[in-house]
């Protein structure tokens, strides 16, 4: 997985070797996109306990140009068609996870429990159509997850395989736009009638 902006996804792939490792990566893409990933594994030699921390961060300003949209001219008095940059379409995501468990035991070929937290902040530039421009609207979400997985070959009977998993997630999402403003593609705005009435 992984994309180059436009609210890209975090790419996390864990290794399967039973040894310590640490992988750190950082990348830069178009539209002010930045990605950073950390994947590690630590094995306790005596018990064989495996701990795998993972962190992924993705940020993009997404300030690419729109094509042939209506916008105000420099005076602000007339409308023209131009190619302005998106000015409120940033994206930030964070995923932090820790997994712990065992492999190649008499009672399990693999058993892991994990806990993770993810966060996404997305600026909203337009509504369902591109001539509806926003300048302060945002969508924020948080998610917690706990899970467990168990794998055993030759379970009870020879060649019988058991794969079991449990997972529970708590999600919270909020979309906010408290600014009573009408925005234009040049980044300017006028105060909406509703806000004017509030101040009266």
Spans of model-derived segments:
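Outer-membrane beta-barrel pore domains and translocons
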Residues: 1, 13, 25-31, 43, ...
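N-terminal periplasmic accessory domains that precede
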Residues: 1-27, 34-39
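Transmembrane beta-barrel architecture of outer membranes
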Residues: 7, 33-37, 50-52, 93-97, ...
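Outer-envelope beta-barrel architecture signal
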Residues: 18-22, 34, 45-53, 94, ...
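Periplasmic-side early beta-strands and strand-to-turn transitions of outer-membrane beta-barrels
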Residues: 27, 46-129
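Residues on the lipid-exposed face of transmembrane beta-strands in outer-membrane beta-barrel proteins
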Residues: 38-42, 57, 96-102, 146-152
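Flexible loop and strand-edge segments within Gram-negative outer membrane beta-barrel domains
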Residues: 62-64, 87-93, 109-159, 169-195
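Conserved small/polar residues in nucleotide/adenosyl-binding loops
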Residues: 198-200
